[in-house]
Amino acid sequence: APWESNLPAVLSIIPDTTVEVIYHDDNRTTNEGFVLPIKRSSVEFQYTSRLTHEQIRLEFVNVDFIYSTTNNNDSHFILEGITKKVKLKDTGFPQLTSGDIIKHKVLMEYGTPREFDGVWHIYEDANSTYKVRELDERNIKVEIMSLKVKKKIEKAIDDTYSKQGIEYKKRLMVQGIDI
């Protein structure tokens, strides 16, 4: 599913029909000192292929809730991130290792990472950040985050809770008063 797909749309294409959506708040303090609840949700499911067993977590955020607390149904939650834990199955001889995946799949397909911090190979393009790391000989972890959704969150917070945003909201509210 593309970034910003809403929760119901993504749920309709997940192969596992027994998924449970978990909702939680992520509190964030603005520069002005306001504590905001950022509405988040996540879905976990498993996918098994010929060579791997994957545990996939899809992370969603409700940017619209920052603008108005009435925007709280599932269609307002948009895809923000994906985390995969990939376990390599026993392939006999030759046995694939996490190092093989990093070397022959990640580096060959994505090239030199923008950054390597000693643990994570970090790639970035205009839309997302892609991070991959070796957990052990048979397990890797992949994290993908949408930069566009992150910017949407920052813009919504700035639009609503900055000094200019608060003044703008006050002007809109005053327009509704007849004197």
Task: Identify the residue ranges that each predicted region occupies.
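Compositionally biased P/S/T/G-rich terminal and signal peptide-adjacent segments
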Residues: 46-75
